[in-house]
Amino acid sequence: MRKYEALLLLSPELATDNRQEIVENLKGVLERQGTTMLSVDEWGMKDLAYPVQKKTRGHYTRFEFAAPATAIAEFERIVRITDGVMKFITVKLADKYVPEGA
């Protein structure tokens, strides 16, 4: 398994409950693919450097997880079709993930 980070930019028009629902759904997608969630950070509402989908603010959420390479394609497919996600990026953080105690 490799260690990844995904950064999501969510629409500022979403209610708090809707944002939490999107985050929980995406965590579920990752867990069904056999990933290990390391952290989920809510960065909150931030001003954007340039408009994205005609919006100047967005809510940032960061996922850090260890996953097999095959899980990333499914995760990104689901993120692309999820309403409320304006932008996202997934990057590989390290060559190999070693669980604690291994």
From Swiss-Prot:
GO cellular component terms listed in the entry, alphabetical order: cytoplasm; ribonucleoprotein complex; ribosome
Highest taxon, organism lineage: Bacteria
GO biological process per UniProt: translation
A molecular-function term among this protein's GO annotations: small ribosomal subunit rRNA binding
Keywords of the record: Ribonucleoprotein, Ribosomal protein, RNA-binding, rRNA-binding
SUPFAM superfamilies: Ribosomal protein S6
Disulphide bridges, residue numbers: none
PANTHER family in alphabetical order: MITOCHONDRIAL 28S RIBOSOMAL PROTEIN S6, SMALL RIBOSOMAL SUBUNIT PROTEIN BS6M
Functional description taken from the UniProt entry: Binds together with bS18 to 16S ribosomal RNA.
Protein family membership: Belongs to the bacterial ribosomal protein bS6 family.
The protein's name in its UniProt record: Small ribosomal subunit protein bS6
Phylogenetic placement of the source organism: Bacteria, Pseudomonadati, Thermodesulfobacteriota, Desulfovibrionia, Desulfovibrionales
The gene coding this protein: rpsF
